[in-house]
Amino acid sequence: MAFITNSQGGSKNETKGGPGALVLLPFTFVGRTVIDWVDNLGAATIFLFTALTKTFGRKQLFKIVEQIYYIGAKSITIIMLVSLFTGMVLGLQSYHALVKFGAQGALGSLVSLSLIMELGPVLTAIMITARAGSAITAEIGIQRISEQIDALHTMRINPLRYLVSPKIIAAIISFPLLTAVFDLVGIIGGYISGVVLLGVNAGVYLHSIQAYVDLRDIINGFIKVIVFAVIVSTVCCYQGYFAHMRKDSHGAQAVGLATTSAVVLSCVLILVSDYVVTSLLI
C-alpha cells in the first residue's frame, strides 16, 4: 500500500502491484543486475580502447616510465617477500606429499611449474591490485571529485591520454616483469625449503626444473599475466574516472567505495579470467 497525495490536497490509498509483483521481484532484481553489468562491461571496454588510442605521443614516454616506477619498482619488495614464502611453503607441502610415493626428486618441477603457470601470475596480479591498483583508483577518483579532470578539459588536455593510458601501458609492462621476479624468487624459496632444510639433493632439484619446464609453460604464464594487467588497470582506472557517477554515494565517500569496488572486482576477474585463459591454453 502506498500513501499518495491527490491534486485536490487530499489523500488516498492505492494498491501498487500485488502478489504478482512479489513473484516478479527476484526476476526484476536479476534482470536489472545483469543489464547494469553488461552496460558497465561495454562502457569499460570502450574506455579501454579509447585510452589505448591516446597512448602514442612524444610526452607519453616520460609518463609511462613514471608509472612503471610507481606500479612496478615500488611493488618489487612486497612481491619478493610474498614469493619467497610462497615458494618455501609450496616446497614444504610438496615434499611431504611426494615423499609418500618416493617421488621427492620431482620437487623442483612441481614447485617451478606451480609458480610459473598459476601462483606466479595470479598472486602477482592480486598483490599489485592491493598495492598499486587501489592507489590508482583513489588518485583518479580524487582528481575527478575535485574537478581537476574538468580543468584538464577546459585546458583542452585529454584526460584519458594524460591520466589513464600511461597507467594501462605501464601495467602491461610491469606485470610480466614482476611475475618473472615472483617466479624466480619463489623457485629459490622452494630450493631453500626442499634442499637446505629438508635435504633434497640440489642437483636433482635443479635437473627436475630443467627437464620438465619448457618455454611454452613460461610463455603461457606471461600471457595470463598480461590479460590480468589489462583487466586490473582498466577496472581501477574506470572506477576512479567515473567515481562521481556512483548512485550509492558522492564526494569522498564515493572515492572510498570506488576503491573498494575496484580491488574486489579486479580480484574476482583475475580468478575468473585465470580459468578462462587456462582452458584456452591447455
Go through each PLM region and give its residues:
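Membrane-interfacial helix-loop-helix connectors in multipass membrane proteins
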Residues: 93-116, 185-226, 230, 234-254, ...
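Selective transmembrane-helix segments that form parts of the transport pathway or gating/packing helices
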Residues: 72, 76, 80, 119, ...
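Active-site cofactor/substrate anionic-group-binding motifs, chiefly glycine-
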Residues: 67, 71-123
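Short, membrane-interfacial amphipathic segments enriched in basic
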Residues: 15-64, 244-249
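Short cytoplasmic-facing helical segments at TM-TM junctions of multi-pass membrane proteins
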Residues: 140-165, 251-255
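Hydrophobic alpha-helical transmembrane segments of multi-pass membrane transport proteins
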Residues: 107-150
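Final/C-terminal transmembrane alpha-helix of multipass membrane proteins
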Residues: 255, 260-277
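Hydrophobic alpha-helical transmembrane segments that constitute the membrane-spanning cores
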Residues: 82-85, 125, 165-194, 235, ...
